């Protein structure tokens, strides 16, 4: 039985084990961010997040329309019973019987594996639902005003399936991952005020520098 639209946004602990496709993007970007958003339900809105939400609203308006030889379907709900994932594709273009999922992103074009994994997951859902091969997809980056065509090859598909397994395992583990050491990712993250990556890293370094004295009351006894 296919999941409901609501099921695509629910945590498995709330009664469904269909992982939201958008959360695969978060996991590939930063497992700690994924855990905060998906498991703990944390979400903060900074300027880039709000701009991205407004841009997606513009993309999703309109339903189905024709653009040249292509038929364009907006905000298409997709799912895979095999992979136990579900979510929305911003656009699905149909040209000559070939499907092209298109994802819209706020930032600038680059080799963003997290975006490619999300796109690949959408494509595999479309393949399962329609029985048609989806050889490639595209990501439109608002910051560059350009579309990046992504080949959905065997390597990317394997990475995507591995991401699904690892993201689900992390959600079920109940263990908050450590912060990244990638300063640029942390700087641009809306959850940085909640995650406190610098502070957490500093505390970990201080604890490690005391040779494993953690768990002992001796340092405080010596100070009295």
Task: Identify the function of each model-found stretch.
Residues 201-224:
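Short microdomains enriched in Cys/His and/or Lys/Arg
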Residues 1-101, 217-224:
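Metal-dependent nuclease catalytic cores that hydrolyze phosphodiester bonds in DNA/RNA
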Residues 38-39, 195-199, 203-206:
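Extracellular/mature segments of secreted proteins
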Residues 79-87, 92-175, 191-193:
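Nucleic-acid nuclease catalytic cores
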Residues 21, 32-33, 157, 164, ...:
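Alpha-helix initiation and N-capping motif
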Residues 184-197:
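Local cysteine-cluster metal-coordination motifs and their immediate loop/turn environment
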Residues 21, 166-187:
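Immediate flanking context of iron-sulfur cluster ligation sites
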